[in-house]
Amino acid sequence: MSMLCYTLIIAFLIGIWAAPKSEDNVPLGSPATSDLSDTSCAQTHKALKTSRNTDQRHPAPKKAEDQELGSAANIIVDPKLFQKRRFQSPRVLFSTQPPPLSRDEQSVEFLENEDALNRNIRSKRENHPVNDHGEYSVCDSVSVWVNKTTATDIKGKPVTVMVDVNLNNHVYKQYFFETKCKNPNPVPSGCRGIDSRHWNSYCTTTQSFVKALTKEGNQASWRFIRIDTACVCVISRKTGNF
């Protein structure tokens, strides 16, 4: 009897020793490990998707340089705006470089802006040019190329003039050929050659309208604007001289 009990106990212990080990020691590639790997991949995919959605809802702020570049971008102009001859004027020039001194290469300077024009008006001609026929100019004038940022249109309203024009990925500057009086009184009595005993006189700058490319918001369009184009003499009869 005791031999039978010992046999049963030994058989029971051998059966326990031969039983499978716990899942902690399951070899790689077993169902337990595959489930863990699939769960990890699913979590990673979910995290990436969430990150992309977050980036789309809250995009990263642009750099200051990019914002400045965007704000300074020129308005792109349709080349068709330049195809109509009625918009062309000999006093308006679009160029990538400063224009020549003048159309006849005489007595014209290039200045950066209107302030420079007012500070530094000078001419390459003599103050009182004399030709072979002994002809004199009643008023002395100076002609210059200028850039304008603002002007007055034909309706008397202020408009913004385009300085830089983006045309076919090339940036052109808009220049205006202006003529102004050099001095309101070229001689002490006023205009040169006027009989001061009977007439009051002085020189003044007159304006004309030219077509210029202007902008309103992000739109470019042609408008008539005033620019200085001539220097003339104005006379009036002195009181009592009839």
UniProtKB/Swiss-Prot annotation:
Classification via PROSITE patterns: NGF_1, NGF_2
Propeptide: 19-125
Cellular compartment(s): Secreted
Cysteine disulfide links: 139-203, 181-231, 191-233
Tissue-level expression: Expressed by the venom gland.
Stretches for region Disordered: 26-69
GO biological process, any: negative regulation of neuron apoptotic process
Biased composition (Basic and acidic residues): 52-66
Domain of life: Eukaryota
One Gene Ontology molecular-function label: metalloendopeptidase inhibitor activity
Gene Ontology CC terms: axon; dendrite; extracellular space; synaptic vesicle
Signal peptide annotation: 1-18
Chief localization: secreted
Keyword set, alphabetical order: Cleavage on pair of basic residues, Disulfide bond, Glycoprotein, Growth factor, Lipid-binding, Metalloenzyme inhibitor, Metalloprotease inhibitor, Protease inhibitor, Secreted, Signal, Toxin
Biased composition (Polar residues): 31-43
Similarity comment: family membership: Belongs to the NGF-beta family.
Family matches, as PANTHER family: BETA-NERVE GROWTH FACTOR (PTHR11589:SF10), NERVE GROWTH FACTOR NGF -RELATED (PTHR11589)
Described purpose of this protein according to its UniProt entry: Nerve growth factor is important for the development and maintenance of the sympathetic and sensory nervous systems. It stimulates division and differentiation of sympathetic and embryonic sensory neurons as well as basal forebrain cholinergic neurons in the brain. Its relevance in the snake venom is not clear. However, it has been shown to inhibit metalloproteinase-dependent proteolysis of platelet glycoprotein Ib alpha, suggesting a metalloproteinase inhibition to prevent metalloprotease autodigestion and/or protection against prey proteases.
Assembly notes: Homodimer; non-covalently linked.
Name this protein carries in UniProt: Venom nerve growth factor 1
Organism listed in the record: Demansia vestigiata
